[in-house]
UniProtKB/Swiss-Prot annotation:
SS bond partners: none
Protein name in UniProt: UPF0213 protein in VLF1-GP41 intergenic region
Lineage: Viruses, Viruses incertae sedis, Naldaviricetes, Lefavirales, Baculoviridae
Family indicated by similarity: Belongs to the UPF0213 family.
Domain spans labelled GIY-YIG: 9-89
Native species: Autographa californica nuclear polyhedrosis virus
UniProt feature coiled coil, ranges: none
Length: 104
């Protein structure tokens, strides 16, 4: 397999909270850089008008791109806000174990 931008890094899943209480879920291979991008209005379009973004959860940087993207998809499409709030409160370092324990 050829080494690419996606395969030669480790990835994490993160959740940001906006002032209005909305949650944003994303993945990155460099959490500090990504948070700065969001803060400088260079990140996701849905966050460009957001102020005071707070990092409320991040997993360990222990996943390949495909695994992190799959977990992000599951959190965005299959999980309620209530589930995400439970995740934030639990703060599991290994997100995949939390998702497996909750049958996701």
């Amino acid at each position: 397999m050829a080494t690419t931008l996606y395969t030669n890094k480790v990835w994490c899943v993160y959740i940001l909270r906006q002032d209005n209480g909305k949650l944003y879920t994303g993945i990155t291979s460099n959490l500090n850089r990504r948070i700065k991008q969001h803060s400088n209005k260079q990140g996701a379009k849905c966050l460009r008008n957001a102020t005071n973004l707070r990092l409320v959860y991040h997993s360990a940087s222990a996943y390949d791109y495909n695994t992190a993207a799959r977990m992000e998809y599951n959190l965005k499409r299959k999980c309620s806000k209530y589930f995400k709030l439970r995740l934030i409160k639990a703060k599991p370092l290994l997100l995949h174990k939390f998702l497996l324990a909750n049958k996701l």
